[in-house]
Every structure is written in structure tokens, then in C-alpha cells.
């Protein structure tokens, strides 16, 4: 019972750490593709080395190394 209470308390602290917002703490935030000198290409593109933790504004594209 104590373990469940401690886990619940930990979750509550993590969600309240953002100044009362309901966003959990993220250790790795997604970055825009262009901020890492990447290029957004169509998801069907075969000659693409994907970049981790990046995103494109168009959901039909993925971030590739330039």
C-alpha cells in the first residue's frame, strides 16, 4: 500500500512541476527539423537517413539528414 501511495505521489509531483500545468516533464523535447539542418521529405522517400527527436510541420513528411 505504501508503494502505491509513493508512486501516486511521484506522478502528482511530476505533473505539477510545470507550474500547475498538466504537462509531464520531458527529458527529450522534439525539435523542428530545420533547427538541426535537416530537410523534410515525403515519408515514402527511400534515400533518407531519419533524424531522431525531430519533427516536420507536415505530418506526411519525415526529417532527413541533409
Swiss-Prot record:
Tissues with expression: Produced by the crural gland and detected in venom from the spur located on each male hind leg. Is also widely expressed in both male and female tissues, including brain, intestine, kidney, lung, spleen and testis.
Which SUPFAM superfamilies has this protein been placed in?
A: Defensin-like
- Which cysteines pair up through disulfides? They are 33-63, 40-56, 48-64
Which residues are assigned to the propeptide feature? 23-24
- Signal peptide interval: 1-22
Q: Taxonomically, which superkingdom?
A: Eukaryota
Q: Which Gene3D superfamilies match?
A: Anthopleurin-A
Instruction: Reproduce the UniProt comment on modification after translation.
Output: Stereoinversion of L-Met-26 (in DLP-4) to D-Met-26 (in DLP-2).
Sorted alphabetically, the Gene Ontology cellular component annotations on this record are: extracellular region
InterPro entries, sorted: Defensin_3, Myo_ane_neurotoxin_sf
Q: Which UniProt keywords apply?
A: D-amino acid, Disulfide bond, Secreted, Signal, Toxin
Q: Does the keyword Secreted apply?
A: yes
Report the subcellular localization: Secreted
PTM annotation (D-methionine): residues: 26
Example GO molecular function: toxin activity
Task: Please describe what this protein does.
Answer: Does not show antimicrobial, myotoxic, hemolytic and cell-promoting activities.
Query: What is the protein name given in its UniProt record?
Result: Defensin-like peptide 2/4
Q: Which organism is it from?
A: Ornithorhynchus anatinus
Amino acid at each position: 500500500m505504501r508503494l502505491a501511495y509513493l508512486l501516486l505521489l511521484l506522478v502528482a509531483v511530476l505533473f505539477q512541476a510545470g507550474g500547475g500545468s498538466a504537462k509531464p516533464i520531458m527529458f527529450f523535447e522534439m525539435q523542428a527539423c530545420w533547427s538541426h539542418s535537416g530537410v523534410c521529405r515525403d515519408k515514402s522517400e527511400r534515400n533518407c537517413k531519419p533524424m531522431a527527436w525531430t519533427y516536420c510541420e507536415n505530418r506526411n513528411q519525415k526529417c532527413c539528414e541533409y
